[in-house]
Amino acid sequence: MHSQQRPNPQMNRHPYGTPGSAPQMRRPGGFAGQPPQMHGPRMVAPPAAPLPKKKKYADKCIHPKIRELEPDAENYMALLASEQKLDSTLSRKKLDIQEALKRPSKVKKRLRIYISHTFIEEKQPEKDTDEASLPMWELRVEGRLLDEQPPAPAIPGQRPVPKRKFSSFFKSLVIELDKEMYGPDQHLVEWHRTPQTNETDGFQVKRAGDRPVKCRILLLLDNHPAKFKLHPRLAKVLGIATETRPKIIEALWQYIKTHGLQDPQERDIINCDTFLSQCFGVNRMRFMEVPNKLHQLLQQTDPLEFNHIIQRPKEGQEQVSTCYDIDVEMEDPVKQFMHTFVHSPGLANDIQTLDQKCYDIIEQINELKTRRDFYARFYTEPAEFIKSWVMSQNSDLKTMNELSGDLEAERFAESYVRPETEEGVQRYMFQKVNQKRHELEQSLGVRSN
């Protein structure tokens, strides 16, 4: 007989499977719930490390049998149900936010432009070796947002979002000076945006001179998406002068629907009225022709124009400054917070860490429940439990040693091949033959000699 082993409290599975679940596969080497036992010197190669199993919602749930033993477990299940509803709501909100981020959302801000100039007086040389400096003036074009909001909090690990600089609002800047005073080569100062442009908070222009100078400043706004100026006739028909291309097409479609210009028979044909005919030069056109014909009626928007006179300030006044307020369109600052909320990994990592703690605790609880069931069955039916345990050990031993047959019967097989056993079998068979012979003779009335 194999020696009976005491149950190891460090087991991982119940011998009969978890209550309420399907029977589990037993590992070779011991009764289910016991660590593998080595029978003989045979060594088994360690199995390859399994891939980490993806956790599911069911892995967080407490088994119903455990809830019967611990009433407070119902409170945990209620919290788990609330968490599932909250996760579902957050997932829907994130999808809504992601869709909102794809749509352009602009808000109008007030940009204040400061145009100022200063004069630098002529400097006489103090020494014979010094050079005299001519009188000069300096023109500055600067600006800032009046109602600028604080930037959205940066994603952890990234730099904070900087404030938007003045030059980022414009596509180009042209300062036109008096051509007669500065000649054809010096009367224009131009700046145009390029992909390599470094943003700045203002522009400075220096020129020699101390006489009053008239200058014209042209600023072209950098709109995203780009805006276009409509032809005067089309602008009068649609009621808009400057707008983006999608907005212009939308306004044109509304005009067509309102006035019933879509052909009732051929739905892809537009029957132009008098006003549209004057704009497009045709009486009928297809919808696919609208973008090309509309493109011919769109022009680049006009730049902002400011006239400024550079002249010496009055006595006691060092700098002359003029302010202009214009409306600019910017990305909705709420989108920055939305982007931070959707793409911030900090909260997701914290939630994942807490979820992993929950998985570990639930796994420990299930292991403790398995141990409890192990000892409870041993306490309730010790004989039946030991019998099942020995049978399980026997089955595991056969699987481990790759054996077949009944090991318990094979242990007593040697007694059947001993000489005394063979002699006993022959005596038994001889006795049985004589007994049958005697019974046959009696039935036939034959008297034996």
From Swiss-Prot:
Observed phenotype of the null mutant: Some knockouts exhibit maternal-effect embryonic or larval lethality. Germ lines are smaller. RNAi-mediated knockdown reduces brood size. Simultaneous knockouts of ham-3 do not survive beyond the L2 larval stage. Simultaneous RNAi-mediated knockdown of ham-3 at the L1 larval stage causes sterility, while at the L3 larval stage, causes embryonic lethality for the progeny. The sterile animals resulting from simultaneous RNAi-mediated knockdown of ham-3 at the L1 larval stage develop smaller germ lines.
Region feature (Disordered): 1-56
Family: Belongs to the SMARCD family.
Superkingdom, natural source: Eukaryota
Function comment: Involved in transcriptional activation and repression of select genes by chromatin remodeling (alteration of DNA-nucleosome topology). Component of SWI/SNF chromatin remodeling complexes that carry out key enzymatic activities, changing chromatin structure by altering DNA-histone contacts within a nucleosome in an ATP-dependent manner. Probably regulates vulva development through the let-60/Ras pathway. Involved in nuclear reassembly after mitosis and recruitment of nuclear envelope protein, mel-28, to the nuclear periphery in the early embryo and in the adult germline.
Amino acid composition bias (Polar residues), ranges on this chain: 1-11
Protein name in UniProt: SWI/SNF chromatin-remodeling accessory subunit 2
Claim: Transcription is one of the keywords in the record: yes
Subunit: Component of the multiprotein chromatin-remodeling complexes SWI/SNF: SWI/SNF-A (BAF), SWI/SNF-B (PBAF) and related complexes. The canonical complex contains a catalytic subunit swsn-4, core subunits swsn-1 and swsn-5, and accessory subunits swsn-3, swsn-6, phf-10, dpff-1, swsn-9 and either ham-3/swsn-2.1 or swsn-2.2.
